[in-house]
Amino acid sequence: MRKVQIYDTTLRDGSQGESISFSLEDKLHIVRKLDELGVDYIEGGWPGSNNKDLELFQQTQRVTLQHARMAAFGSTRHPRYQADSDPNLNALVEANTPVVTIFGKSWDLHVKTALGITLDENLDLIRESVAFLKSRGKEVIYDAEHYFDGFKADLDYALATLKAAEEAGAHTIVLCDTNGGTLTSDIQERFVRASRHVSTPLGIHTHNDSEMGVANAIVAVQAGAMQVQGTINGYGERCGNANLCSVIANIELKLGMSSIGKENLRQLTEVSHYISELANLLPRTDQAYVGKSAFAHKGGIHVSAVMKETAAYEHIDPALVGNARRVLVSELSGRSNILYKAAERGLKIDKSSAAAKIVVDKLKEMEHYGYQFEGAEASFEVLFDRLVHETKDLFELDGFRVITEKKGAGEPYSEAVIKLRVDGAEEHTAAEGSGPVSALDRALRKSLTTFFPCIRNVRLTDYKVRVLNSEGGTNAKVRVLIESSDGQESWGTVGVSENLIEASWQALVDSITYKLKKEHGPRKKGSPADKATASEPRPGRKEAVGSQHS
């Protein structure tokens, strides 16, 4: 089986992406994670340009890598220096990495305008730089910057630069689509021409400015590339680099070649999300292979087909890349969605039962009103129990009042007063918070903790508001998504109303109800302890606490 080397440049090219800044500690964590994934090369940075990268190379000397080889990055020598006195080349040697990657000019435009030298002088820079690094015992990877644009402008000269690197002893020559503007047909033609001109193993380095980064990398592999350079999640300058998550999966699962191996491939989703976290960026849900939505199904017909044969709407088994199938509940849902989602959460229902139709109809009614259960699956489970098992909540709300007050130049504060009943016992509680929702959340938990100590550890960890009809101005309908956690599990709930506090209350009630259900089990209607309920299933909760707040 043909092996394709994976060269990761997340720490150098990836960190040039907007809003990305890895700390030294972040970079060390990423090095270890990439090594575990099984990539062949990890480009740590440019030691000649900043102290952080130089320190990284010093730190990685103490890290035992199981698979990957560290690479330092730089350029060919400066025209005014000889190779042995060039500060950049000497910094590469002093980085003490087994591999050094340098880039040189392949496009005559850059030679004449950026470097301001003759074409022959540029060939000397390439030869002498590669030869110098080789003489210091380095594995030298030569990146032919702007090769594809250079080929278009002057193919003979572009090929001559490759020959210069080969003659000096480069181990690998990487053809770079630095501007990211080349189409796949041109990538293939120009790659093949290069492979006929030099015998050194060739690699590919593509950018995504034309949304072709991954496609161009794969075309080059099919044309014979032995190495692919890219970044995890496609991070990089401008529109980013070739996304290695997609490249690796395509090599392993589509081309029948080897890169990191099938076993390591199962780590791909985890590594993608891990590096997103360190980059302080939200993972792209629609990212191929590793995104949360990559194997998410919403349409009822699709879900029905997937339940019978996964290949009907999935091009691979999600588990192969460490991902998982998801079925979404929405107004597009049919009974198949409900059955799958119910089974996924350990809930039982017969497809042909009247209850299944009731759930589907209620969901469609609520989604039409503005509810959305993607990311609020705890609300779905609470609703399911109310409709199918006819459960009641463990507490009944008599009413609440929320007041926000500001005095002078001081910070505003909010106070919530709640009156509710648990098994007939009345609880009247007040709490303050930094805002009305915070106060309401604290008051609700404070009033219930005496009866249900298990909610003492429940915390609101995320709160999102979306305006559903902005043309309504201050009377617009809003959807509130809340994420809660007890330290062991996290769950999401939803509420919708023209009143922000009411929408928040709905989501808070579902959050507490979900936790109590997990701890105490559902309460059926008519049970001895069944005195009342907090709120019934709602078509937008039109009946819910309209007069219970001010």
Regions found by a protein language model. Give the residues of each.
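Terminal-proximal interaction/regulatory segments of ATP-powered molecular machines
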Residues: E432-V437, A443-L444, V480, S484-D486, ...
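Mixed-charge, glycine-accented linear interaction segment located at domain edges/termini
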Residues: G487-K524
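Short beta-alpha connecting loops at secondary-structure transitions
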Residues: L175, Q229-E237, E252-G261, V321-L328, ...
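Catalytic alpha/beta core domains of metabolic enzymes, predominantly
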Residues: N179-T182, Q188-K308
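Alpha/beta enzyme core
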Residues: V4-I6, Q16-Y41, Q59-V63, H78-T200, ...
